[in-house]
Structures are given as structure tokens and as C-alpha cells.
Regions:
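Serine-esterase "nucleophile elbow" of acetyl-processing enzymes
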Residues: 1-50, 66-72, 76
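Alpha-helical cap/lid subdomain in secreted, periplasmic
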Residues: 2, 61-155
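Solvent-exposed loop/turn segments at secondary-structure junctions
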Residues: 13-16, 42, 51-56, 82-86, ...
Length: 155
């Protein structure tokens, strides 16, 4: 396998290094994902084109634009999924018995990801896929539901 010297990171807030500040409860970019160490230890250059709120649908559009402009890299790290599988929690709280779909339904998520992978491979760019980090369900639920009727959301 060839040395992947030029890497582009394409994903959501996790790959961007955005976290919630425990004091202010606001989003901050901390960049504690170790890109400088990776560049140094593995002789890489990494350009982080990740975006807050990105899903596979937005990622596919971003990748298309990058490819049209002549994306010059050896590999693309892709980290999507968290925003794809999110729900509109206020709508769930207002109508818990109704059907609610994730932001990007699973068939579209699969189609978008496969399309991105295929486009990269056609250009001899290695797709590097990551998986979501584990989350703490109670903290996640409390954060996203906030002041909503959590009992209704649980139904």
C-alpha cells in the first residue's frame, strides 16, 4: 500500500474537534483530535474540511465540489453518522405517537456514503472511514431534549 502523505478530513463536528464547554454549555473548537501529532509522527499533511452539523448528504455535496476543483490528496478520512441519525426532538415531544424519521433515513445514508467511497476510489484516493465514538445515552438525551417534555419523547 502506498504511503498516504496528504490527507483530507471530511466529516462533522466530531472530526472538526468541536465540543461542548462544560462551564458555558456552548460549542467550542478544541481541536483535541491530535492532528498535529499525526502529522509529526506519521509524516503527513492533514487538511481538515469538516463542518459542524454535516451529514452524509452535505458531505457528498462538499466532496463533489472538492473533486471538481481537483482534490489533491492520497486519502480522505470520513466521519459521518451522528447528524444523519439525529431526530427533530421537538416534533417527537409534540407528537410522540407519530412516525418520526432520522435526519437522513438509512437507505439515503448508505447511498450517500457508498457514492462518496466510489468517487474517491475512481480517482485513486483511499477512503478512510471512521465510526462514531460511544456516547452516554442519558447525557445525550438530556442535552438534546433540554426543556422538552421528556416523558412524551420516551413514548
Amino acid at each position: 500500500m502506498k504511503h498516504l502523505a496528504r490527507i483530507v478530513a471530511l466529516g462533522d463536528s466530531i472530526l472538526k474537534g468541536i465540543q461542548v464547554d462544560p462551564e458555558t454549555k456552548r460549542y467550542v473548537t478544541r481541536n483535541e483530535i491530535g492532528i498535529p501529532a499525526l502529522e509529526r509522527d506519521f509524516d503527513l499533511t492533514v487538511r481538515n474540511d469538516s463542518h459542524f452539523g454535516a451529514s452524509t448528504v452535505k458531505g457528498a455535496r462538499l466532496l463533489d465540489r472538492m473533486l471538481e476543483r481537483g482534490l489533491a490528496c492520497d486519502g480522505v478520512v470520513m466521519d459521518f453518522g451522528g447528524n444523519d441519525c439525529d431526530f427533530k426532538w421537538a416534533e417527537i415531544a409534540a407528537a410522540p405517537a407519530a412516525e418520526h424519521l432520522p435526519a437522513v433515513p438509512l437507505p439515503e445514508f448508505i447511498r450517500s456514503y457508498r457514492s462518496m467511497i466510489g468517487k474517491l476510489r475512481q480517482r485513486d484516493i483511499v477512503p478512510i472511514l471512521t465510526t462514531l465514538p460511544p456516547l452516554e445515552p442519558e447525557l445525550f438525551f438530556d442535552w438534546w431534549c433540554g426543556r422538552l417534555d421528556q416523558g412524551a419523547v420516551h413514548r
